[in-house]
Amino acid sequence: MYAKVFNLKFVKPTDAKVASSYFAENLAKFIRPCNMQSISISLGPCGSLTITAKFDSGSDLKTFELQSKSVFDDIKTSFDFIQTNYSGVYIYTFEAENAATEITLN
């Protein structure tokens, strides 16, 4: 499993909130075209924003990098922030499945 991680640190925490909505709306458009397995967007208290996207193949990750560039370029023209990115492979991940396992009888 491959990952692309974007760490953005905004000057103003309110800018990070606005940007998180923008990213959620616009990066979701790449789920199908880039065969994305998951995406998470996290907002930290002091204007930090982290976006993590998972892919099954390196070529899907590269496609996402190319296609999503315009989304990040749009934000750069609107807000002041510092951005660091890296691509990597998952070594360990755990996610509990949200499913009700009880049966209620009436």
Predicted features and spans:
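Short S/T/G/P-rich N-terminal loop/turn motif that feeds into the first structured element of a domain
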Residues: 1-49, 54-70, 83-106
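Outer-membrane beta-barrel domain signature
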Residues: 72-79
